[in-house]
Amino acid sequence: MLLRAVAAAAIALPSFFSLTSAFAQTDSERSPVILHAGRLLDVEGGRIISPGEVLVENGRIVEAGTSVAHPAGAHIMDLGDRTLMPGLIDVHVHLFLHPGAEDLQTVEESVPQRTILATLAARDDLMGGFTAERDMGTEGAGSADTAVRNAINQGLIPGPRLRVSGNAVDILGGHEDAIRFNPEQHVLSNATYANNVDQLIEVIREQFKEGADFIKIYETGHDTFRDGKFSTPYQYTEEQLATAVKEAARVGKKVGVHATGEPGTLYAAQAGVEAIDHADQLSDETMRLMREKNIPAVPTFTISEYFADHAASPAAGTRLHEQLAFHAAQFKKQLAAAVPMAVGSDVGPFPHGTQARELVLMVQYGMKPADVLKADLLNGARVLGWENQIGDLKPGYLADVIAVDGDPLQDITAVQKVAFVMKGGVVFKKAAQ
């Protein structure tokens, strides 16, 4: 019932009218399409091919290169002096959050209202060039993200391919347990409690029953940054996390974590989580394990920058900018230690559809554009469990293709200038001529 209500409400909005014609088409009804542009990104090779063409048929890429076969009846789309590249991937989003007081919106807005807003967020992310995402928790909206995912998959509303987690998992008094509110008001947690191994297993099974694709666990609590020193308490032991990872693996699924620093990040790496999100500070041992186990760090710089720029006071802004600079310095150490990276922005508290800023910041803080694009597209596809399906322009891959103004290898800000979006062979954003 919720799925039908959300889909109907979303499609009824005027801003969706221009997109509904795309939903009426099926893969089998579309003729072959040839995308032509001035350039094409070779992700694995870290180079630009010029000119670039992609042949799309039945929602998948048939061929890509400087020139492709032109089957009879194919529709040619000339995208001009732009770069064809795979759709962007964000492995850390919050579709159920929007700019404003995060704690208040989760209390004041009903789950149906937040779900409708989440459909708009999904649309905005897709229009921003993000064709696949990992939603890292509804922050108190339970499993409502499964309705959004399912509506997208059924072609009822526009949005990226989604991996969803439902409510994140947290301890009593932990990171999302309404600790800033008057305890006498008994404000509900934005996460689901699990305080021991037995509760972890029960919650994980319940989350999967409700449709979660993976489990999101808050491994670290409230961060402290004073006099240039960063600290954060762990919330689950390595044994508890390992149990969670094992239980998820039992049904072929994975565990993601919010983990900003030691020792929680070490416990997460030891347990074998799919990625370590935020990763403000990592020990040498943690970095070694991440490198050996191929566990990527997901720095989420954009949310830190946004909070610093929109702080409640000048003093708070100064402190948050100092903490961001600290994280940037730690990021350089992680790069030097060959820690794998993936790209996640933590979008939600800042406007959806603008999170390509994350790639820009990762270059600003030390990565080469080609390496950031590999982190986003190749490592991102692996984190989402869609490796060899998305993240590159190869025969057999899903036709998730965008076109950007400029050359992202020369100027990474090109990824913020998305002119064209195709997902699964369906055009959702047409380039202006």
Q: What label would you give each PLM region?
A:
Residues 100-102, 145, 174, 225-228, ...:
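Histidine/acidic-residue-rich catalytic or RNA/ligand-binding cores of hydrolases
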Residues 250, 323-408:
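His/Asp/Glu-enriched, well-ordered alpha-helical/loop segment
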Residues 82-156, 172, 239, 271:
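Metal-associated gating/positioning segment near the N- to mid-region
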Residues 27-31, 40, 45-85:
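Histidine-rich, glycine-flanked metal-binding segment
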Residues 104-116, 179-202, 254-256:
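Active-site mouth loops of central-metabolism enzymes
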Residues 118-143, 158-168, 212-223, 254, ...:
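Divalent metal-dependent hydrolysis catalytic cores, especially in the metallo-beta-lactamase
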Residues 4-21:
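Bacterial N-terminal signal peptides
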Residues 147, 197-297, 322-340:
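Histidine/acidic residue-rich metal-binding segments in metalloenzymes
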